[in-house]
Amino acid sequence: MLVNYDKESQAIAYGITGGIPEYLSKIDTNKSLDENILDLFFDENGTFFEEATNLLKQEMRNPASYNSILGAIASGASRLNEIANKVGLDTSACSSLLKSLIELNIVEKIYPVTEKESSRKTIYEIKDTMFLLWYKFVRPNYSNIQMGLGHIIYGQYVKPKISDYMGYVFEKMCTEYIYQEQVFLTLPFIPEKIGKWWGNDPLKKEEAEIDIVAINSDSCLLCECKWRNKELDSRVLTVLNSRKDIFKYKNKSLMAFSNSGFTEDAIEYAKNNDIRLVSFEMM
C-alpha cells in the first residue's frame, strides 16, 4: 500500500493512522509524508483534522470530559490522580471515564509485567496511536490550525517531536515482533506474559524502566527499543545489561531494537554479552 515510501516513512504512516487500512488508504504516496501529515491533520479541511473528536462524539454522551482526559494523558499525565487533577475531576469519576475509554480500545491500563493486575503502580496510556498524535499535537493547536497556521505549527513544533512520538509507536511495533517470534518459537523460551516494566533498581538505588519484558516462571527477556536518527551504541547496551541484576529469574536474555542500526562497538559488545540485536530491516 505504501510501496513508494521507505521503511521508516511506512512506520510513521502506520503510527499516525493507527495502522487502520481505511486510514492508511487516505495517504497519497505521490506526496511526501510531511505533505500528507499537513494535509490530513494540520488543515481544517483535512480528513483527520476532527476525526478523533468525531469518533468520541459518536460513542460518548459527554465527549468534553473524555477530550480533557485524553489531552491530559497526551501531555504526560499517566497516573489516575495526575489525570484527575489535570482535568478537575475526583478520582472516582475519572476512573469511570477511563474505563469507558479502555472499553473503546483508545486507552490502556498498564502495570509492570512482574506485578499483579491489582498493582498500585498502574498507569494509563493512549493505546490508539492516531488518537495519541491528535491529542498530542492537533488538539493543543486547534485554533491556530483553523486560522491557517497549520504549516507553521507542523514545521516548528510538531516535526521536531515526531521522533519522540515514534518512540512510543516503535515500542508497540517491537512488542508485536516479540509476539511474532513467540509464535515462530524463535525466542529463548515461551513467555507467559509480555509487557513493560518499571520500578526500583535496588543495586543502583534509582528508578529504572525497561521497554519490553517477557517472562515465564523461571526466565525473562529484557528488551530496549530505540527510535532515533543515529545508531544505537554500546552505552545503551551496557545499561540494559546491568538491568539483568534487578531480576531473580534463573534464565535471563537480552534484546535490543534500533530503527537506525547499531554502531560497531555496540555490535561487538552484543557479541561478547550474548545480546540479540534486531535492526529495523529485520522486522
Placement of each model-derived feature along the sequence:
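A cross-kingdom feature that marks ATP-driven nucleic-acid transaction machinery
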Residues: 122-283
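Short amphipathic alpha-helical interaction segments
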Residues: 87-105
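Conserved nucleotide-binding/hydrolysis micro-motifs of P-loop NTPases
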Residues: 21, 31, 114-115, 229, ...
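Winged-helix-like regulatory helical subdomains adjacent to P-loop NTPase cores
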Residues: 33-85
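Short, cationic-aromatic polyanion-contact patches
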Residues: 37-41, 58-63, 79, 109-138
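Short, surface-exposed connector motifs at secondary-structure boundaries
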Residues: 5-6, 77-79, 247-252
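Amphipathic alpha-helical "lid/sensor" segments that cap RecA-like P-loop NTPase cores
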Residues: 2-55
